């Protein structure tokens, strides 16, 4: 069975989607305020877009596109921006590397655009062939679907082609199935503008991660530490986990002054988990580095390794 189906059936997916929805809602709202009029655009980059097939939430007869998948959630906020703040440019870039999955993504997104109305396809390309690409526009908002490997993505290309300067704000969504799918390279992170925030999935024990040898699991430490080491001085990193045997966890980077807001969203997100009671564990790096490191160790190490104090 594909891993994405396992994840969806675990009941954790609604938690992830709730958190993404709340963070995007806040960021689209904040970047539409007058103090951000100098931004060339607010850019949302989904590095692991998938097929755009929504997951059915508990109690629903049919899945809801704008709540049940990351492309639907991103597009919901982008369309709202186009309607409410057409003078505030925004861009959504969705990247999917598998050709068949990309075709399904394109079909699902284009079908929903027809329902929303007002979106028009454009001929403006970011990449030259052979990279498959599909673009659409509504007022000052654009969406770009790219069939490529996110490991090869850098922001300067879209900025150049869209005539945007580097004075923009960026949100990154990174939802890997396993460590090899992690898309936030240090090269990408260091190339991003100073107003960049992110939400990443940390698979932790899904599929028996703690049965992997320690060298493999150390890569999760390396990924989190790399993100923590590139934080702006006014930003912080949050580890949010929801307990249980699968130990799903998320890494969030955001302005320090948003700690309270994001922590509350995390607690509410944990309540969205289906099939079990989920207890939210939340630690902020700059608030308490010791607790943050302990949180990492509990997520990535076995009980025996924790007891040995060798790691």
Regions found by a protein language model. Name each.
Residues 13, 64-67, 217:
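Flexible, glycine- and charge-enriched loops at secondary-structure boundaries
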Residues 143-214:
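Active-site segment flanking the S-adenosylmethionine/decSAM binding pocket
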Residues 18-154:
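SAM cofactor-binding core of SAM-dependent methyltransferases
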Residues 133, 137-138, 152-163, 224-227, ...:
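Acidic, divalent-metal-binding catalytic cores of TOPRIM
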Residues 53-56, 101-104, 154, 180-182, ...:
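Short catalytic/ligand-binding loop motif for oxyanion handling, primarily in non-cytosolic enzymes
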Residues 105-119, 214-230:
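Short, aromatic/basic amphipathic alpha-helical patches
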Residues 219-311:
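Rossmann-like AdoMet/SAM-dependent catalytic core
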Residues 1-18:
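Basic, amphipathic N-terminal segments that precede the first structured/catalytic domain
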């Amino acid at each position: 069975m594909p891993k994405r189906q396992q994840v969806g059936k675990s009941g954790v997916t609604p938690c992830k989607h709730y958190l993404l929805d709340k963070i995007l809602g806040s960021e689209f709202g904040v970047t539409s305020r007058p103090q951000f009029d100098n931004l060339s655009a607010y850019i949302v980059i989904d590095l692991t877009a998938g097929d755009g097939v929504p997951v059915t939430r508990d109690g629903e007869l049919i899945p809801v596109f704008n709540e049940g998948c990351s492309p639907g959630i991103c597009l919901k906020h982008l369309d709202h921006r186009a309607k409410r703040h057409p003078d505030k440019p925004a861009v959504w870039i969705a990247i999917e590397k598998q050709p068949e999955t990309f075709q399904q993504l394109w079909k699902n997104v284009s079908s929903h655009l027809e329902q929303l109305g007002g979106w028009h396809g454009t001929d403006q390309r970011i990449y030259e062939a052979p990279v498959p690409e599909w673009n659409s526009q509504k007022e000052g908002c654009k969406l770009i679907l790219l069939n490529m490997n996110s490991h090869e993505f850098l922001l300067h290309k879209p900025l150049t082609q869209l005539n945007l300067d580097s004075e923009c704000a960026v949100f990154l969504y990174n939802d890997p199935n396993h460590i090899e799918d992690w898309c936030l390279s240090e090269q990408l992170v260091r190339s991003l503008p100073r107003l960049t925030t992110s939400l990443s999935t940390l698979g932790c024990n899904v599929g028996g991660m703690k049965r992997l040898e320690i060298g493999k699991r150390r890569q999760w430490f390396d990924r989190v530490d790399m993100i923590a080491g590139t934080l702006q001085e006014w930003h912080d990193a949050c580890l949010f986990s929801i307990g249980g045997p699968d130990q799903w966890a998320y890494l969030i980077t955001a302005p320090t002054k948003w700690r309270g807001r994001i922590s509350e969203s995390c607690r509410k997100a944990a309540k969205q988990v289906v099939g079990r009671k989920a207890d939210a564990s939340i630690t902020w790096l700059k608030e308490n580095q010791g607790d943050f490191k302990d949180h990492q160790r509990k997520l990535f190490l076995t009980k025996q390794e924790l007891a040995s104090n060798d790691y």
